[in-house]
């Protein structure tokens, strides 16, 4: 059976472009409509009435997949994302299931929305493939799914990890630990990779016994530092995979009588507003959270409203180190 996917492949466009072209959508250029029609004629393709009725439905709604709203990081993305989408005439719907499988199974993740923002993707995730099969435009925000060419607004996580490693080396630290995020996330993996590479360039090792990993949450930081402090060698510095982990580690240090920064340097990643609170004064890796979210919205709107099928665009934000009160020289 010939499908719109076959027509798209022959015409060199996306499936959504095929649907728009065959219904005479004026957002598609005349040249592209003619190319799609020639491909459809060559394959004797006739769109089904069901498919046509679905493809012509414009809802002006965008689904946003965020699996953990208890993480203080995500509310600081949601506000700017909402505002940018609203400026383009779209309303936002939140999907907050704990697993991507649950999200993918929901009826809402179909043509009842015009596109999807994936803010919690994991490496090897099947959700992007599900969206492609359903011909739903999507964009990665903050995390990617590993190797898939797709629109994305992300941070140069590897560079951020390198910046932390260089700073710690310049401060004279040699016994260093890392409490990172999940290895199945690009954010967790890339930040640790950059950190390891930066330490290696300075001639410093990072033994596996000095590394802990877990969800990007408070408990990972608290538990991770507690375990590291119980080990044979106490570190003088710890790099945490995000600020929430770092705040957990900060509290664990206080509970165990470890002074920050006198006894232990602590550096996070993301620079959420909480990091700047006087209670923490967390040194961390900074990038513009609001602009990251707004760029993801712009990329998705571009994908939805484009005349033709544009090449995937990956916007990479450059981070910088913000030094506050949780770092010191050895």
Language-model features: locations:
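Flexible loop/turn connectors
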Residues: 226-227, 231-330
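Periplasmic-binding protein-like
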Residues: 113-120, 177-179, 211, 232-242, ...
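Hinge/beta->alpha junction and helix N-cap segments in small-molecule ligand-binding domains
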Residues: 49, 67-76, 94-103, 153-163, ...
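Residue-level detector of anion-binding/catalytic polar loops
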Residues: 46, 86-91, 137, 174-175, ...
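Short beta-strand segments enriched in small/hydrophobic residues
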Residues: 15-20, 55-69, 76, 80, ...
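N-terminal helix-turn-helix DNA-binding module of bacterial transcription factors
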Residues: 1-60
């Amino acid at each position: 059976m010939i499908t719109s996917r076959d027509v798209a492949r022959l015409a060199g466009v996306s499936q959504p472009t095929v649907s728009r072209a065959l219904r005479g959508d004026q957002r598609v250029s005349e040249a592209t409509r003619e190319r799609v029609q020639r491909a459809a004629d060559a394959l004797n393709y006739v769109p089904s009435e069901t498919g046509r009725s679905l493809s012509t439905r414009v809802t002006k709604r965008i689904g946003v997949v965020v699996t953990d709203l208890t993480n203080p990081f995500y509310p600081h993305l949601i506000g700017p994302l909402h505002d940018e989408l609203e400026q383009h005439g779209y309303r936002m719907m939140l999907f907050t299931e704990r697993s991507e499988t649950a999200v993918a199974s929901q009826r809402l993740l179909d043509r009842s929305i015009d596109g999807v923002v994936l803010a919690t993707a994991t490496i090897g995730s099947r959700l992007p493939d599900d969206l492609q099969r359903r011909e739903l435009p999507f964009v990665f925000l903050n995390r990617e799914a590993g190797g898939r060419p797709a629109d994305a607004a992300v941070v140069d996580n590897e560079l951020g990890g390198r910046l932390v490693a260089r700073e710690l080396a310049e401060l004279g630290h040699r016994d260093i630990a890392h409490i990172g995020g999940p290895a199945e996330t690009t954010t967790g993996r890339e930040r640790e990779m950059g950190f390891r590479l930066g330490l290696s360039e300075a001639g410093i090792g990072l033994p596996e016994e000095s590394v802990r990993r877990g969800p990007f949450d408070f408990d990972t930081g608290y538990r991770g530092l507690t375990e590291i402090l119980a080990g044979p060698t106490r570190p003088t510095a710890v790099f945490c995979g995000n600020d929430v982990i770092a705040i957990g580690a900060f509290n664990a240090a206080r509970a165990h009588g470890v002074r920050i920064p006198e006894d232990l340097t602590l550096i996070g990643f993301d620079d959420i507003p909480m990091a700047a609170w006087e209670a923490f004064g967390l040194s961390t890796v900074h990038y513009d959270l609001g602009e990251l979210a707004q760029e993801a919205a712009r990329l998705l709107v571009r994908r939805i409203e484009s005349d033709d099928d544009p090449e995937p665009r990956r916007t990479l934000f450059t981070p910088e180190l913000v030094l506050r009160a949780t770092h010191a020289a050895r």
